[in-house]
């Protein structure tokens, strides 16, 4: 073990020596750059661009370019990057992560690699976790870039597509991680090239990279559309039933946070809904609503997992930052179940049109780099998933913060009493205190106790984060007491007020350990910036969430040794801190394994998404006739249909092929079995294909000119691709839930998902080609639409393309015995089974 540790330390030292060598080269240009006039310094940008065009690499330009930015920052901002910041900038340019402590000037460090990479003219994206930081950094650092002749854009959610396009065309674009992801998805849903806003993804520099690429790695970005639904009453009824249950009627698995009805709960459900068997196929919709109502009532907690806004909206709380996640909703009906639980307006269910995780979004950039103060604990994940190394950068001044040993109490009550007493003592001597909590609920509780103790304070949590930067800025003033959820206010420095250094600097008090050591380190790092004095102290109790879920038997043994009559007794032990850390490592390991598994599943979707999006983009950007592609689809559709039916006896095969031809290729009265009898399969294929080509030419002759034909072809393909892709996303989601159970049969769920997902993708491609064929052959192209065929709108597309073949008679005699809840209903209504006959009993 010690050999491995020594090797790691030596590797880090060797890396730092290399960085220092390049940094000294940058510093060697300092006097020369200082001697240049403003005009000459600004002229360096076009000079570098020309040299890059002439074949010099960015690595060759680096020392000089970094020196130019240093001098420009000194003249424009009055700030001059230190050597450690130059080293951090080199690491960023190499596509790695410099671990730089809080207050070491990460924002200024980024200016050097951002400027250098912007010289290539392919765009640089600086990614931050919220719009406040994007706007602040773009405004402050943008002065340097603008002064040096580079354009800077800010991409905000509220901007129009035209404004977004302009922002992305700039040399440097500031944006949030979510907005870049949503823009990528929306770009792959448009029908005209001019509606796209992004350029190809080149270089992203992610601020607080651990927050985006680790904490939010599993978060899918979802673009969805509302599905018309009459399910609100069903959510309310399921909620009313679940609220009648006793604790023996359901079973909760605490570590995995899963829940299900017990036998007594099933009996109650059957009685409440007047059913003979809750798990009968006909009740598949009902079990879905009941499962969600159970989760909403007994797993999802108000002020921890979500808050209710003043407007009566359910807002998700980010478990890592404590911020509310505006515009995000729990999926698969859970959000509606929570709305029913809280008695607020139930919003419509939505259907996913496009989705991507941050893991796959950021892996699409040609080069990816990031900055953070705490990433070493996740080094393996950064290396394996993103191919990024973590390089710890030394601080400019030694750290003077004192980190005290954790204090452990028996109960939550005794722990909070001790926290309030500590805060009061420090407040009375004027030392500023930042109290960090894991949940909104805890911050409200401590706030209440501080009010009772007569201590004035500010609360920063998911309920009022719009004031967060202001509150955090004042947290270092004399006598300031601030309560903050987790890492709220991250990215904003806490500067010490007058006389605070003499009092010991800012004291950070953690009210419990987070399940990730990194988050605890971030909280500690709020104190002691740039060599300032400071303190940190964590208070724990045996009733904390981490202890209850993952505490070891050795920790629990402490409780037995305690004097139960005196709950205020406190344990202070290094060994205890190590035990807590090992519990955290276990959780981090579990979380990493989960993220790795999510990535394995998501890679299946990624490969398929890239194929669909590449083909889609090819259609959108096409200036050529798409006839060859459409004809190839028609040919494959005919071949598939004939091959599929030729396996039955010949008479039945001919009848089936005739039915296919009548419904999908030719006018009904123009073909009969007689015509095809006696022909071989290849002859039938050729005959049908020739007939299809005649109809194809006839259809296109109704359109005004070549532009109208191209627009029609594009709309035809894109409309069907988008529709089928949306259905496929939903189907993959259901498959993923289903294969999880196959582990019990000794089958690897990921392998099963990959093979079945591939087969479903092949089927989807076949379905796209079939629908393109059928719609092309059967569409009614109205005379009055000719003049408007070049003006795309989804409504025009729907008017231009009205397929006679789509839709079948309602079949009330269908067999429902083997139908899954997300399958198409056998009655041919066009709805999913769960939204049609699967709902009937409910």
From Swiss-Prot:
Zn(2+) binds at residues 825, 827, 836-837. InterPro entries: Helicase_ATP-bd, Helicase_C-like, P-loop_NTPase, SEC_C_motif, SecA, SecA_CS, SecA_DEAD, SecA_motor_DEAD. It is a peripheral membrane protein. GO terms for cellular component: cell envelope Sec protein transport complex; cytosol; plasma membrane. Transmembrane segments: none annotated. It is found in: Cell membrane; Cytoplasm. Keywords: ATP-binding, Cell membrane, Cytoplasm, Membrane, Metal-binding, Nucleotide-binding, Protein transport, Translocase, Translocation, Transport, Zinc. Its cofactor is Zn(2+). May bind 1 zinc ion per subunit. Its EC number is 7.4.2.8. The keyword Metal-binding applies. Disulfide bonds: none annotated. ATP binds at residues 85, 103-107, 493. It comes from the Bacteria. GO terms for biological process: intracellular protein transmembrane transport; protein import; protein targeting; protein transport by the Sec complex. Part of the Sec protein translocase complex. Interacts with the SecYEG preprotein conducting channel. Has a central role in coupling the hydrolysis of ATP to the transfer of proteins into and across the cell membrane, serving as an ATP-driven molecular motor driving the stepwise translocation of polypeptide chains across the membrane. Belongs to the SecA family. Monomer and homodimer. Part of the essential Sec protein translocation apparatus which comprises SecA, SecYEG and auxiliary proteins SecDF. Other proteins may also be involved. This is Protein translocase subunit SecA. It comes from Streptococcus equi subsp. zooepidemicus (strain MGCS10565). The lineage of its organism: Bacteria, Bacillati, Bacillota, Bacilli, Lactobacillales.
